[in-house]
Amino acid sequence: MEKKKSKTNLLQKFADKFKKKKRSRSAPTSKERTSEISKRKSRSPSKSKVTTGNSHGASTDNKTKTDTNRMEVTAKGFKKAKDAKKLEKKKEETGPSKTPSTIALRRAESQMELSGNRKNVEKGVKTWVEQLEKLVEIRKLLEADFKPIDTMKVDLEKCQAFKKNIDYCQSENVELYDANRVKGGGEADFFYHATVTSIPSISTKSTILAQLPLSDSPHSLESFWLMVAAQKIQRLFILIGEDELDKAALSEYFPEDFKEFKTIRVNNRKTVSKSDEQPNTQLYYEVVPKDCAEAPFAMIEICDFWPDGKIPTVSYGRIAATAASVFDSDIDSDATCAIVSNYGAGRAGSFLVGVQAIEKLQAGDAPNIKEIAMSIRSQRPCAIETLPQYVFTYIIALTYGLKHVKDPVLKSKTEKVISQLEQFACEKMMEEDEEDNTTCE
């Protein structure tokens, strides 16, 4: 009977796992749990009967009594285990959830350790830091590197859709090229201010840089969600300042429950608030175009660490980890991701430079920030708007690299370079603020 109890408990555990899996609507989570189950050691099937000898002449009554006692003990044990599982389940529901991106980030770190990619990152950091250390005047070099980016001209003849739909743009000063603008699901007149960018020499994956929709325009909001569906965007990183949008303002863009437009509806299936284990608030949406049987999911990640017109001065580790997760997220092979800010330009472009620089480090190479920034700016006008933003792209990638450096000497050198860059970026940001104040006066 004890072996029968073992089998019962095993079936109960499997049933509990199945219920949890069924409750989850996120594909990445289901894959993760399936992987965990497959890695468990297989147990031999329990026998349904216990063979007992009667060589000592034990009476039938004694045997029946013994079996009855065992059944009572087993029943009590099963009830106890069942109550414990209920308590555990209740704790899981009230406690902080571990989301797919959290799992993906931890798995990525584990894979990096096992596969040797950590050594690649350290190799790339070593080469890069040595290059930066040789520069006598690193500040002058950064200023000189940023100048051609800042003065890059936009050919307005290649921005016809932008000029035609200027009323649906956050700013008339952030242009949009026709060649790589986001298209809808085949509709000729579809428009949304977003750009498909790619740097094939670094990654085969493309990334969409987009503005936030106009909150007072139902047409703009609808176009935003149509873009998400048409481009199969499964993850969107929303870059805002901590006090830039309150809860009410944020819900105008991303509904707390359900919202229906003329041609598409969105349903908030789950919200995971920011916590110690989860660096950014995550909103999971079911995005269903009209007359579409499928209900694809999109995850909105609220990255409230980057104030408008400035650069972050804290949470470098959180920012670097978020940047590293853009391409390391477990999304479908034919899906894409998007980086969104108010204009989809300065912050979004700078963050993407940091993302691409991390890709280079993971390949064991020192990134050329100037080349990456020039490429992104040539595809998305006004991407990387200020010198402090340009300098901060170095800080993002070096902070990521620092986490994977084991050599104490290299670690110390990397920390020193980050400190120098941070000081320079903050000084330039203060200078720009003073200039803005003088202009306003």
From Swiss-Prot:
One of its GO terms (molecular function) is protein tyrosine phosphatase activity. Residues 1-100 are annotated as: Disordered. It comes from Caenorhabditis elegans. Residues 142-400 form the Tyrosine-protein phosphatase domain. The keyword Hydrolase applies. The keyword Nucleotide-binding does not apply. This is Putative tyrosine-protein phosphatase B0280.11. It is an enzyme of class 3 (hydrolase). Pfam families: Y_phosphatase. Residues 30-39, 80-95 have a biased composition (Basic and acidic residues). SUPFAM superfamilies: (Phosphotyrosine protein) phosphatases II. Residues 50-61 have a biased composition (Polar residues). It catalyses: O-phospho-L-tyrosyl-[protein] + H2O = L-tyrosyl-[protein] + phosphate. It comes from the Eukaryota. InterPro entries: Prot-tyrosine_phosphatase-like (IPR029021), PTP_cat (IPR000242), Tyr_Pase_cat (IPR003595). Belongs to the protein-tyrosine phosphatase family. Non-receptor class dual specificity subfamily. Its EC number is 3.1.3.48.
